[in-house]
Amino acid sequence: MVKFMPTTYEIIIYGRIQHVGFRERIENLGHALGIDGIVYNYEDGTVRILANFPSERKKKLFKDKTNFWRVRKCK
């Protein structure tokens, strides 16, 4: 079995994602996947995720599109 080294990611989410429970859903999903990090709202309307996890978990984080239907862009 191959072990993946954790990497720190800063993910910036753009779209109509504030005041709709998006941050809380992402925090809950991260906890369920065993991802350590923080999710916070910025004044410019973006949501930023700073998290440390192995790259194979990134696919799981973004797999369920129902959590991201309001997302316009992710960087």
Curated annotation (Swiss-Prot):
Residue span(s) of domain Acylphosphatase-like: 8-75
Protein name, UniProt field: Acylphosphatase-like protein MJ1405
A molecular function GO annotation: acylphosphatase activity
Pfam families with a match to the protein in the record: Acylphosphatase
Organism expressing this protein natively: Methanocaldococcus jannaschii (strain ATCC 43067 / DSM 2661 / JAL-1 / JCM 10045 / NBRC 100440)
InterPro entries: Acylphosphatase, Acylphosphatase-like_dom, Acylphosphatase-like_dom_sf
PROSITE patterns (UniProt xref): ACYLPHOSPHATASE_3 (PS51160)
SUPFAM superfamilies noted in UniProt: Acylphosphatase/BLUF domain-like
